[in-house]
Curated annotation (Swiss-Prot):
Described purpose of this protein according to its UniProt entry: Catalyzes the formation of the alpha-1,6-glucosidic linkages in glycogen by scission of a 1,4-alpha-linked oligosaccharide from growing alpha-1,4-glucan chains and the subsequent attachment of the oligosaccharide to the alpha-1,6 position.
Alphabetical list of SUPFAM superfamilies matching this protein: (Trans)glycosidases (SSF51445), E set domains (SSF81296), Glycosyl hydrolase domain (SSF51011)
Enzyme Commission number: 2.4.1.18
CDD domains linked to this entry: AmyAc_Glg_BE, E_set_GBE_prok_N
Pathway as given in its UniProt record: Glycan biosynthesis; glycogen biosynthesis
Record keyword NADP present: no
GO molecular function, one term: cation binding
Stretches for region Disordered: 1-26
Xref: NCBIfam families: branching_enzym, PRK05402.1, PRK12313.1
Keywords, in A-Z order: Carbohydrate metabolism, Glycogen biosynthesis, Glycogen metabolism, Glycosyltransferase, Transferase
Subunit structure: Monomer.
Name of the protein in its database record: 1,4-alpha-glucan branching enzyme GlgB 2
Family label: Belongs to the glycosyl hydrolase 13 family. GlgB subfamily.
Gene name of the record: glgB2
Length: 659
C-alpha cells in the first residue's frame, strides 16, 4: 500500500494535520501511522476513521487547504464539486484512487470553512453520475438543502473531567439511573423556531436538576433529511444536525449537563439508513454501505436500507462513529436503536421473503458478530461509557458478557414490561382482575437481563395516546392512575426512562413540529401538581438506595402478595444493600379505598408512611396516614410471620418502612 506522501504524489511534502481536539497543536502523520490507518479501515478494525476520512484542513507542501478522502469501491471516477468550482465537474478536482479497495483522495489548497461541497461519483461503467454528501462530513446544510459543509473540529474547553473520572471508576448497576428522554427540536422552542444547543442548555440543565433526573437521553442528533423521522433515518452520521447549531454548541450542552452531574445518553442507529439520493444509499451507483443482496438490504417496512454489517469498511464506519460520539462529545452511552432488526433475518419479512443463515436459522450472524465487537470496543476504549439495547424479543444474552457468549450490552429496554403494563392500565378496573398476570409476570424473567423500564417516545405518538390519556376513567381517575403507575414503575426493579411531557400529564400526543404544552402547568392546577408529584417521586427514588442498589440481584426484591387479583393489589418489598433498608409498596389498581387491608411484613416493629401518591399536594384526595404509626402484630399472613392492617388509597400507592 502506498504511504501518505505517495497519496499526495509528493516525495518530500510536509504533512501537518489538525484533527479533533489536540490542544490546538498540529500533528504530523508518519508513514507507519497512515499505513496502519488505511489497513485497519479496510479490515473493519478502525475505530477512529473520522480522523482521516472525510474532509480535513491540513498543510501540505507549505500550502493550507483541505484533504478529501472517501471510500467508493466501484466508482470509476469521483469529482469534488462545490462553491469553489461552481459545482462543475472539472478534471483538476478529480480524486485519485490510491488503492484497489476503493480509497480515493485529493488535496485542494486555499479552501475555507463554510464552503459547501459534494462528491460526484461515476458508477463502475462510467455511464451514470450520482451526487453524494460526504459520509464523514462534520457539518451538513440545513434541510431541505443537502450539501456537506467544510468545518473544523475546533478545540473545546471541557470542564467535565471530574464527571468522566467518576464515570470510568464507578458502574451504574448499583447506582440510581432515572432517564429523561427528549427530542431537542420539540422540548422547547423560541418563538416557534428551533432553539440552539446553547439556548437549550440554559433551560434544560436547570429543569433536569429541579426534577431530579440523573440522565438525559437525546433522540438522534446526527443529520437527517426528514423532521418526521426524528433522526432515526439518518444521512450524516458524523454531522451534528444543523437544526440546532454546530459541534461546539452540542459540546456546550453536554459539558454543562456533566458539570451539573447529569449524564448524557444518545440514541444511535447502526441498523439502517435512509434512501435519500444524496446519502449513503447506492453510494457509487451500486450497493456500498448496504447489503449486496436486495432482500437483505431493503427495509420495506421503514422505507430504508439495512447496513451491511459484515463488510469491513462499513464496520469501520460504524465503529468509528460510535467512538466519535463518545470521544469527541463525551456522551456517556449509546442507546442502540432497532437491535431486533439487526439480529433477525426475517424481521418484518413474510415467509419466502428471506433466506436462512448457514445453520438454517433466522439469526443474522454478521449482525451478531458486529454487536459483540461493538460492545467489546466500547468496553475497552469507552472509559465507562455504556450501551443500551432497544430489543423487543426474547433473544437470550443481550446483556450477558461477550466472554460468556452474550452480546455484551450493559442494559436492555424491557419492552415486555412496558407493553404488558400499559395494556393493563387502559382496562376498566372491573376487568383488571382477569389480567393480573400482566403486572406480575415481569418478575418471572426480571433477572435474565439487566433491564431499563422504558416509557419512550414511541408510546405517546401515532395514535397511541399520551401517557395520561392511556389511563382509564375521568380526569381525576386518569391523574390518580398516572401517579399510581409511575410509583409502581419506580418501585419495580430496573433503571427508569420517561419521555418528556409525561411528567406533567400533557394530554395531547407528542408532536415533533411544536414544543410541549408547557402553558398547561400555569393554567391548570392539576398539571402543576402532577409535575410536583414526579419531582417528589424522583427525589424519593434518589434518596432511597433500596430502589436501585440491588436492581439486578434477586435479594433486592420480595413479593408480599403477587397474586391478589380479586382486589387488584400488588404488594412487595424493595431491599437495599445493607438489608436493613427496606421499603414496602402497596399498589391499589382499583378506585376503591381498602380499609384495614391486611399485608404480611418481614419484621415486628412500628411502620410509618414515607410516600403516598394520594396526597393532596399531588392532586389526590388525601387518603394518607400522615404521622400515624402502625404496629405489626405476630399474626402471620401469607409467607410472613407478622402482619399489619392499613388503609390503602384508591388508584394509589402507599409506601411504608420500619420506623
Amino acid at each position: 500500500m502506498r504511504n501518505y506522501k505517495e497519496l499526495k504524489h509528493e516525495k518530500n511534502g510536509n504533512v501537518t494535520e489538525k484533527i479533533g481536539e489536540n490542544k490546538g497543536k498540529s500533528k504530523k502523520m508518519s508513514k507507519d501511522e497512515s499505513l496502519l490507518s488505511f489497513d485497519l479501515f479496510l479490515e473493519g478494525k478502525e475505530h477512529s476513521a473520522y480522523k482521516f476520512m472525510g474532509a480535513h484542513f491540513i498543510t501540505e507542501n507549505r500550502k493550507r487547504g483541505v484533504r478529501f478522502t472517501t471510500w467508493s469501491p466501484r466508482a470509476s471516477k469521483i469529482y469534488i464539486i462545490g462553491d469553489f468550482n461552481n459545482w462543475e465537474l472539472k478534471e483538476e478536482y478529480s480524486m485519485k484512487k490510491i488503492n484497489e479497495r476503493g480509497i480515493w483522495s485529493l488535496f485542494i489548497p486555499k479552501l475555507e470553512e463554510g464552503i459547501k461541497y459534494k462528491f460526484a461519483v461515476e458508477n463502475e461503467c462510467g455511464n451514470n453520475t450520482v451526487y453524494k454528501s460526504d459520509p464523514y462530513a462534520f457539518k451538513s446544510e440545513l434541510r431541505p438543502n443537502t450539501a456537506s459543509v467544510l468545518t473544523k473540529i475546533k478545540s473545546f474547553r471541557w470542564g467535565d473531567k471530574r464527571w468522566l473520572n467518576k464515570r470510568e471508576k464507578e458502574g451504574l448497576d448499583n447506582k440510581p439511573m432515572n432517564i429523561y428522554e427528549l427530542h431537542l427540536g420539540s422540548w422547547k422552542r423560541k418563538d416557534g423556531e428551533f432553539m440552539t444547543y446553547e439556548e437549550i442548555s440554559e433551560v434544560l440543565v436547570e429543569y433536569i436538576k429541579e426534577m431530579g433526573y440523573t440522565h438525559v437521553e437525546f433522540m438522534p442528533v446526527n443529520e437527517h433529511p426528514l423532521d418526521a423521522s426524528w433522526g432515526y433515518q439518518g444521512v450524516g452520521y458524523y454531522s451534528v444536525t444543523s437544526r440546532y447549531g454546530d459541534l461546539n454548541g452540542l459540546k456546550t450542552l453536554i459539558n454543562k449537563l456533566h458539570k451539573n452531574n447529569i449524564g448524557v445518553l444518545l440514541d444511535w442507529v447502526p441498523s439502517h439508513f435512509c434512501k435519500d439520493e444524496h446519502g449513503l444509499f447506492m453510494f457509487d451507483g451500486s450497493p456500498t454501505y448496504e447489503y449486496e443482496v436486495w432482500w437483505k438490504a431493503n427495509n420495506e417496512g421503514w422505507g430504508t436500507c439495512n447496513f451491511d454489517l459484515g463488510r469491513p469498511e462499513v464496520k469501520s464506519f460504524l465503529f468509528s462513529n460510535a467512538m466519535y460520539w463518545i470521544n469527541e462529545f463525551h456522551v456517556d452511552g449509546l442507546r442502540v436503536d432497532a437491535v431486533s432488526n439487526m439480529l433477525y433475518l426475517d424481521y418484518g419479512r413474510e415467509y419466502g421473503e428471506w433466506e436462512p443463515n448457514i445453520y438454517g436459522e433466522n439469526g443474522n450472524l454478521e449482525a451478531i458478530a458486529f454487536l459483540k465487537e461493538l460492545n467489546t470496543i466500547i468496553k475497552k476504549e469507552g472509559k465507562g461509557a455504556i450501551t443500551v439495547a432497544e430489543e423487543s424479543t426474547s433473544w437470550e444474552g443481550i446483556t450477558k458478557s461477550v466472554e460468556e457468549g452474550g452480546l455484551g450490552f450493559d442494559y436492555k429496554w424491557n419492552m415486555g414490561w412496558m407493553n404488558d403494563t400499559l395494556s393493563y392500565i387502559e382496562l376498566d378496573p372491573i376487568y383488571r382482575k382477569y389480567h393480573h398476570n400482566k403486572m406480575n409476570f415481569s418478575m418471572m424473567y426480571n433477572y435474565s437481563e439487566k433491564f431499563i423500564l422504558p416509557i419512550s417516545h414511541d408510546e405517546v405518538v401515532h395514535g397511541k395516546k399520551s401517557l395520561i390519556n392511556k389511563m382509564w376513567g375521568d380526569d381525576w381517575k386518569k391523574y390518580a392512575g398516572l401517579r399510581l403507575y409511575a410509583s409502581f414503575m419506580m418501585g419495580h426493579p430496573g433503571k427508569k426512562l420517561m419521555f418528556m411531557g409525561c411528567e406533567f400529564g400533557q394530554f395531547v400526543e407528542w408532536r415533533e413540529w411544536e414544543e410541549l404544552q408547557w402553558s398547561v402547568i400555569e393554567e391548570f392546577d392539576i398539571h402543576r401538581k402532577t409535575k410536583e408529584y414526579f419531582k417528589a417521586l424522583n427525589k424519593f427514588y434518589l434518596e432511597n438506595s433500596s430502589l436501585w442498589s440491588l436492581d439486578y440481584e434477586e435479594e433486592g426484591f420480595k413479593w408480599m402478595d403477587a397474586d391478589n387479583s380479586e382486589e387488584s393489589v400488588l404488594s412487595f418489598i424493595r431491599i437495599g444493600k445493607n438489608k436493613k433498608e427496606k421499603l414496602i409498596f402497596i399498589c391499589n389498581f382499583t378506585p376503591e379505598v381498602y380499609y384495614d387491608f391486611k399485608v404480611g411484613v418481614p419484621e415486628l416493629g412500628e411502620y410509618v408512611e414515607v410516600f403516598n401518591s394520594d396526597s393532596l399536594e399531588f392532586g389526590g384526595v388525601g387518603n394518607i396516614m400522615g404521622d400515624s404509626i402502625l404496629k405489626a402484630t405476630e399474626e402471620s399472613f401469607k409467607d410472613f410471620d407478622y402482619s399489619i392492617s392499613v388503609k390503602v388509597p384508591p388508584l394509589g400507592t402507599l409506601v411504608l418502612k420500619v420506623k
